From Swiss-Prot:
InterPro entries for this protein: Tail_Gp41-like
Species name: Escherichia phage Mu
Keyword Transcription regulation tagged: no
Protein name as annotated: Probable tail assembly protein FS-gp41
Pfam families named among the record's database cross-references: Gp41_Mu
């Protein structure tokens, strides 16, 4: 998102949401009412959490609706309802209100707060995905480096290049890796 050309207001909103996500608490502009009558108190601090597989399953089930068609009853899933169900489950708390929020509470948000919350959860998801990609990418890079080292070792020992070793079927490649490991101990 940083690479896009955002207008000054959009960039300011983006930067404030990023800073708040990093601090662990997102601030609502207008707040969410808690309580009734004179006892109503506005809640502003939102804590987000990662969705679980159970959250995703529950959101999908909640987004489905049974409708009648010419062929009989059919389950239809609403993408917008799925998004709302995921959003409400991703909210750990808003002030003293524990999540997941009910749809009735989501409806009480101002348009600005709803949009801010939607953007924040999207950015939060992107940050989580990026961190997972970096972790897994690092694992893949280490694995790839190990494979290339093993292929080079096999190529040196068998007097051919690493390309030959990498073109082998995996079972033969790993068998040669084991042989190269054993042989390299004797060639030191």
């Amino acid at each position: 998102m940083d690479e896009m050309n955002l207008g000054p207001e959009a960039q300011e909103l983006h930067d404030s949401i990023v800073a708040e996500i990093q601090s662990g608490v997102l601030k609502l502009k207008d707040g969410l009412p808690f309580g009734t009558g004179d006892e109503t108190e506005m809640q502003y601090d939102v804590t987000l959490r990662e969705l679980t597989a159970g959250d995703m399953i529950d959101a999908q089930a909640a987004a489905e609706k049974l409708v009648m068609s010419k062929e009989g009853p059919v389950l239809v899933s609403s993408p917008s309802r799925m998004g709302l169900e995921m959003l409400r489950r991703q909210i750990a708390s808003v002030g003293c209100i524990k999540g997941p929020l009910s749809m009735a509470l989501i409806r009480k948000l101002s348009v600005d707060d709803f949009q801010r919350l939607s953007l924040a959860t999207e950015m939060y998801d992107m940050a989580v995905a990026a961190s997972l990609t970096q972790e897994r990418g690092g694992e893949w890079l280490r694995c790839r480096n190990d494979i290339e080292k093993a292929a080079t070792a096999i190529g040196v020992i068998l007097k051919s290049g690493p390309e030959w070793a990498l073109s082998l079927p995996l079972s033969r490649f790993f068998r040669h890796c084991q042989q190269a490991k054993t042989l390299s101990q004797y060639h030191r």
